[in-house]
Amino acid sequence: MKKSLLVLLALMLVLSLGACAKEEAKPVDQPAENAGETPAEVPAEPAEDPVELVFSINAVPGDAHYEAMMKFEEIVEEKSGGNIKVDTYHSGSLFKQDQETAAVKSGEADIIYSSAPWLVEGSPWLSMFNAGYMFKTYDHMTKALNGEVGEEVFERVAQEQGIRPLSAFYLGTRQINLVADKEVKTPADLNGVNLRMPNSDAWLFLGKALGANPTPIAFSELYMALQTGTVDGQDNPLPTVQSAKFYEVTKSITITNHLVDNVWPVINEAKWQSLSDNQKTIVVDALEEARQLCDDLNLQREAELIEFFKGEGLSVYEADLDAFSEEVLGKYLDNKELTETWDMDLFEKVQAIK
């Protein structure tokens, strides 16, 4: 009997301990972590809206700045993963050159090629950038306009006109091309030379400053004017002398470097501000690659053309650049009426760049 009682007590003890263990294993009622909430997540970056950029240019296939814009279009679409689409209308197929400034201001075009002379009406101080020897060389020009001075100039244009230049591409440097085989060392050597210039006050003043007798002739009539002796010469970048075949009716070229031609990709300011920071970076980076392509092509062509013209029988002379620069710029600075709109502080900044 005692034995049975002990067995029963032992069994009850085992069952009791098992129940206690089960109770301890049961979780205590606690509010669930973040009860009633979904787990916190890092907010996703908002998706960028797709962008279309309508680019109107008057450059034609074969021009370095045409090739540059095809490169720009390719890079932008690739780097944006197709988020930015560039529609380039070349050869003036969308807007003619004299229509483009109004088109980009109104937003009918998003980007155009422009330059200081085309934007003078809205920013008169820009006239100084088309003065003879404002820039001495390609390096001088690109250091200025693609550096801190350019940032200041482009921001100011954006504030004044609602359009923003983004870079400065090299088009070529204008040289003197004469019908006669004549060596030109200083402006005095151009005395009495009827030099064709575009028909505007600014261009005609440049012709006088160079020491010549400026004669306005339309570009379309220039070949015949050189051939018949209506004018004694003309000035243009070397690639233009080749493409227009002026070398067929002239006998000498003098390297004067009197005007470093450049062109600016200009975007509508409202369009620019509508882009995200990432999209702006893509556009700026693509333009820099396009600029390098354009500049390299034009520099290479100019170097090759010297030998080409010599092979065609033209004499190529080197002018005294210091003599030309000092006299030509001096004539601008002496003409207070011409320079009254210039920003002289900005002018001095440009001249100080080496």
Which role fits each region the language model picked out?
Residues 154:
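Conserved glycine-rich "GG(E/T)P / GGGxP" loop and the immediately following alpha-helix
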Residues 21-28, 42-139, 149, 158-160, ...:
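N-terminal secretory/targeting leader peptides
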Residues 16-19:
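C-terminal motif of bacterial Sec signal peptides marking the signal peptidase cleavage site
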Residues 1-9:
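Positively charged n-region of N-terminal signal peptides that target proteins for export
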Residues 33-45:
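A short, compositionally biased domain-edge/stem linker segment
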Residues 143:
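Short beta-strand-centered segments that line the small-molecule binding cleft or hinge
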Residues 3-4, 23, 27, 35:
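N-terminal cationic leader/targeting segments used for protein routing and processing
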